[in-house]
């Protein structure tokens, strides 16, 4: 018996690459730009707005720090207590890497330690529930 040819083996990872690119989350500096008060804020969903059918929960319950959508507010609140969310808040508390810091690292200045930034713990675009108790 001879050796079998592995035809098409060079295309084996193309689907995995597509899925990896599809699930890619925004980088920390992009999230910092969103969370800054002077940055352009992402518009909050209106209560009477039409939900986006492509996003979980219609895109109404989003954690800005983790850039994730959730199906309802209960899952969003559970996420706020999770280890992944707390780890992301710790990553966001460090000032993002800047051009000035890169120049200092290249020898064009003295080292300045990155500042710690205050990040709100519950950062979401959740629509508050209407009070119907009266």
From Swiss-Prot:
Spans traversing the lipid bilayer: none
Function: Involved in pre-60S ribosomal particles maturation by promoting the nuclear export of the 60S ribosome. Negatively modulates the DNA binding activity of Oct-2 and therefore its transcriptional regulatory activity.
Keyword Chloroplast appears in the UniProt entry: no
Family note: Belongs to the ZNF593/BUD20 C2H2-type zinc-finger protein family.
Gene Ontology molecular function, alphabetical: DNA binding; preribosome binding; zinc ion binding
Zinc finger (C2H2-type) boundaries: 61-85
PROSITE patterns xrefs: ZINC_FINGER_C2H2_1, ZINC_FINGER_C2H2_2
Region listing for Disordered, in residue ranges: 1-58, 85-134
SMART domains the UniProt entry points to: ZnF_U1
Primary location: nucleus
Cell location: Nucleus, Nucleolus; Cytoplasm
Gene Ontology cellular-component annotations: cytoplasm; nucleolus; nucleoplasm; nucleus
GO biological process per UniProt: positive regulation of transcription by RNA polymerase II; ribosome biogenesis
InterPro entries noted in UniProt: C2H2-ZF_Maturation_Protein, Matrin/U1-like-C_Znf_C2H2, Znf_C2H2_jaz, Znf_C2H2_sf, Znf_C2H2_type
Alphabetic keyword roster: Cytoplasm, DNA-binding, Metal-binding, Nucleus, Ribosome biogenesis, Transcription, Transcription regulation, Zinc, Zinc-finger
Composition bias type Basic residues, residue spans: 1-25
The species this protein was found in: Mus musculus (Mouse)
Compositionally biased region (Basic and acidic residues): 26-36
Protein name listed in UniProt: Zinc finger protein 593
């Amino acid at each position: 018996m001879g050796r079998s040819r592995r035809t098409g083996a060079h295309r084996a990872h193309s689907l995995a690459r597509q899925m990896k690119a599809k699930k890619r989350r925004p980088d920390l500096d992009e999230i910092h730009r969103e969370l800054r008060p002077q940055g352009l804020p992402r518009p909050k969903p209106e209560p009477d707005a039409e939900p986006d059918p492509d996003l979980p929960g219609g895109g109404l319950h989003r954690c800005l720090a983790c850039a994730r959508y959730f199906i309802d507010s209960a899952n969003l609140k559970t996420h706020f207590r999770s280890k992944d969310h707390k780890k992301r808040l710790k990553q966001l508390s460090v000032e993002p890497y800047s051009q000035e810091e890169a120049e200092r690292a290249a020898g064009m200045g003295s080292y300045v330690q990155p500042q710690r930034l205050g990040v709100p713990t519950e950062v979401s675009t959740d629509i508050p529930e209407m009070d119907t108790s009266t």
